[in-house]
């Protein structure tokens, strides 16, 4: 079984994906980490983020061991990832990696922006997770504080709104809800409530009550 979870930045999709994977014994891939790794490599090299050819070359030679780098979680890397992920050549370079991961048994949970629409359009379960920009900004603010990083919630909110626009309007795999995805509004659910709601969606499919 493949579970595709999509949604905007800081919507809570990553946490839900990890918990679902643990619950069902499936493998988990946060596809955003892949793009963050490309972005950080570009930043570390002092490269122009708008240089599509350079970014695509980085993507093709990406070292998976970089995926665990705590620095990938920084706000700056996240903003840079939004830029490099808009490059069609970068996305093309990383599509096969994601599809291969999804196809491996016994099952997989992938979260990102285009899992249900591009990477795994035939996924048995598709969930589109949303939350208000204000709630998402506050979550990112708290995350930054927990890491001891300076943060301005108003700036984070502004960046999130801008990132949403970039993600929705990019030419390559724009952020959008798949027609057969279930919408899960995570604005005012705690972690356990969100996980229960997601499990209910998956169980409905497993029981054959609903084709998602």
UniProtKB/Swiss-Prot annotation:
Coiled-coil blocks: none
Any one GO biological process: pyrimidine nucleotide metabolic process
One of the record's GO cellular component terms: cytoplasm
Gene Ontology terms for molecular function: ATP binding; CMP kinase activity; dCMP kinase activity
Location of this chain's protein in the cell: Cytoplasm
Main location: cytoplasm
Binding annotation for ATP: 7-15
EC number: 2.7.4.25
Protein name per UniProt: Cytidylate kinase
Gene: cmk
